[in-house]
Amino acid sequence: MAQSKRVKAIAAAVAPGKAYAFEDAIKILKTATKAKFVESIDVAVRLGVDAKKSDQQVRGSTVLPAGTGKSVRVAVFAPAGAKADEALAAGAEAVGMDDLAEKMQAGDLSYDVVIATPDAMRVVGKLGTLLGPRGLMPNPKVGTVSANPGEAVKNAKSGQVRYRTDKASIIHCTIGKASFDDEALKSNLQALLLDLVKAKPATSKGTYLQKVSVSSTMGPGVTVDQSSLSLK
């Protein structure tokens, strides 16, 4: 099905302004999912914050209980010893300090996540212009600067997603693959939303979770009725 036809098919199945129970929203998306690859199911959450204010920016990470369906390559900056061994035992593809930095500067950037122990940030700091634009710079707010690199690696590989409000105060995130069953997708979305609620800025007023929409990789969004979710 051509993309334009798929978009029209989803649009035709969605009543303007209507919020659908989660299961119904996912059914609409899966019915129209005809890509030659397994599409992701993504969520957009509009928050009741003013993203222009530094104290209302929402940033963090969530470990999705059903995972993301993606294979994740992880690099860890940690000094030789217990921390490095811990990261390797957890499944990190690369662990090092200056040697790892040199490899990255030479073009080895085939990683989805970069983690660092606090004492390794002196090395990582030199890679800011390299890692920053790629969204790979370790940050304590999303759990990628950690004194427990083994745990951080396990989280990254077991389905950790990172989020940050954009200029329109919207969070964009994946909650799995279209091949996931509905309960897996639902548990992932609920875990994300619960963490977003925990991250609510103290200065945010009014309705916080203003709108939740789900979409497939190639399709438009379908608004989810939040009452169909368990957010307590």
UniProtKB/Swiss-Prot annotation:
Assembly information from the UniProt record: Part of the 50S ribosomal subunit.
GO biological process: one example: translation
Summary of the function given for this chain in its UniProt record: Binds directly to 23S rRNA. The L1 stalk is quite mobile in the ribosome, and is involved in E site tRNA release. Protein L1 is also a translational repressor protein, it controls the translation of the L11 operon by binding to its mRNA.
InterPro entries: Ribosom_uL1_bac-type (IPR005878), Ribosomal_uL1 (IPR002143), Ribosomal_uL1-like (IPR023674), Ribosomal_uL1/biogenesis (IPR028364), Ribosomal_uL1_3-a/b-sand (IPR016095), Ribosomal_uL1_CS (IPR023673)
Family: Belongs to the universal ribosomal protein uL1 family.
Coiled-coil spans in chain: none
Presence of keyword DNA-binding: no
Disulfide pairings: none
Keywords (A to Z) from UniProt: Repressor, Ribonucleoprotein, Ribosomal protein, RNA-binding, rRNA-binding, Translation regulation, tRNA-binding
Protein name, as recorded: Large ribosomal subunit protein uL1
GO CC terms of this entry: cytosolic large ribosomal subunit
Record GO terms (molecular function): rRNA binding; structural constituent of ribosome; tRNA binding
